[in-house]
Swiss-Prot record:
The keyword Aminoacyl-tRNA synthetase does not apply. It comes from the Bacteria. Cell division inhibitor that blocks the formation of polar Z ring septums. Rapidly oscillates between the poles of the cell to destabilize FtsZ filaments that have formed before they mature into polar Z rings. Prevents FtsZ polymerization. InterPro entries: CAP/MinC_C, MinC, MinC_C_sf, MinC_N_1, Septum_form_inhib_MinC_C. Keywords: Cell cycle, Cell division, Septation. Interacts with MinD and FtsZ. SUPFAM superfamilies: Cell-division inhibitor MinC, C-terminal domain. The keyword Cell cycle applies. Belongs to the MinC family. GO terms for biological process: cell morphogenesis; division septum assembly; regulation of cell septum assembly. This is Probable septum site-determining protein MinC.
């Protein structure tokens, strides 16, 4: 009995286009050859006005940028097809380290004094104060267990979902992503309480009571393990 040939490329139609499941064990050259053959055999007809979106899933195979471009070019050369995404279940060690740095909580215990700048890639948990003239900057969220009386910039790399929270919120300036808020009005003596700042639907920074944070950003609960 003739042995059935291993299928390295599986094509599945979806309501949004097609999905290509590519085997992660065969050689890359074998994969490209079979992909070319199968896409040439199947003719995908569109309405003439729109392209058919293709999602490519490569499993546990890591693709270099050059290899990804080879796949994109091959698919692009077939009529009516355009690559929407190429998805892999693996990343390089360098990418993993970069992701960890961007998402981890960095706990620091100190006072940020006037003229000093504290900068972290991920989420900042500062146990201490930010004095007037001091600056804290984070790629993610900023949590200050103390007084925030200087400048705080969260989401500096464009994260508009980032928040700033402090036990005592009386800053010189707040900035989230590219949105800036000057110092809010000073509170009456004894009126200081834990507050948070976030960007609202009108693209303005709003300062409100800390208790609202879990409703505004429910995903922040995932950071609790990093804080505790």
């Amino acid at each position: 009995m003739e042995e059935k040939k291993q299928q390295n490329v599986t094509i599945k139609g979806t309501k949004d286009g097609i999905t290509l499941h590519l085997d992660d064990c065969c050689s890359f050259s074998e994969l490209l050859k079979e992909l070319d053959e199968k896409l040439s055999t199947h003719y995908y007809e569109s309405d003439g006005r729109s392209l058919i979106e293709v999602r490519v899933k490569v499993g546990n195979r890591y693709l270099t940028e050059v290899q990804q471009e080879e796949i994109r070019t091959l698919i692009r050369n077939k009529k009516n097809l355009v690559v929407e995404s190429i998805e892999s279940d693996v990343i390089t060690k360098a990418e993993a380290i970069a992701w960890k740095e961007e998402t981890e909580i960095v706990p620091i215990s100190k006072i940020v004094r006037s003229g000093q700048v504290l900068h972290v890639k991920g989420n900042l948990l500062l146990i201490g104060d930010v004095n007037p003239g001091g600056t804290v900057i984070a790629g993610g969220n900023i949590f200050v267990l103390g007084s925030l009386r200087g400048i705080a910039h969260a989401g500096y790399d464009g994260d508009s979902e980032a928040v700033i929270a402090a036990s005592i919120m009386n800053p010189m300036q707040l900035r989230i992503s590219d949105v800036t808020m000057r110092a809010p009005e000073e509170k009456e003596d004894g009126a200081e309480a834990a507050e948070c700042a976030y960007i609202n639907e009108n693209n303005h920074i709003v300062v409100d009571r800390l208790q609202l944070l879990t409703h505004l950003r429910p995903n922040l609960t995932k950071l609790e393990r990093g804080i505790v």
